[in-house]
Amino acid sequence: MRQKKRAAAVLLSAVMAFSAVSPAVPVWAASWQKNASGSYIGSDGSVLTGILSRGIDVSQWQQNINWSAVADDDIQFAMIGTRYNNAVDPYFDTNVRGAAAAGLRVGVYLYSYATTTAMAESDADFVLNLIKDYPISYPVVLDVEAQEMNGLTPSQIADIINAFCKKVETAGYYPMVYT
């Protein structure tokens, strides 16, 4: 089971890393369909290469989500926001439970304002405490794009990321980074 989770985390990380260096995907990505052979096709009928699965990133900004409709649209996973204005995202519980009930794999992310390793460890504690009773099957992600980090050196940012990821991995989850 642990190998399957690690493989899923590695796959998701690879997909997200590939996405980061790939050209921007047009808005019509929402209309992707699968052809008879199981490949995704664009709105113009061309086969899209490198697409392994579809997922969404949601938080309080999307408000009420029809998770059955999401699953019916060939979405296989959801990355759920955990925090908004230093409190639990008001839609976190509803989103995790709804996504899981619809059969989606669930991961979570935390938009971090950490500027020290102690703050990153506190962020990890916040997330780990929040998710302990939920069916998390995809990575626990640290989102490191806050303006507060702009003045930090690459070494300081790496230390922050490593502090968060170490705590998450020690707790039995697979850490990942959004940038």
Give the positions of each predicted feature.
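Sec-dependent N-terminal signal peptides
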Residues: 5-20
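Aromatic-lined carbohydrate-recognition surfaces of secreted/lumenal glycan-active proteins
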Residues: 171-179
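Substrate-binding cleft of extracellular glycoside hydrolase catalytic domains
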Residues: 35-42, 46-172
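N-terminal secretory signal peptides that target proteins for export/translocation
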Residues: 1-3
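Sec-dependent signal peptide cleavage junction
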Residues: 18-32
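Hydrophobic alpha-helix-in-membranes signature
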Residues: 22-25, 138, 174
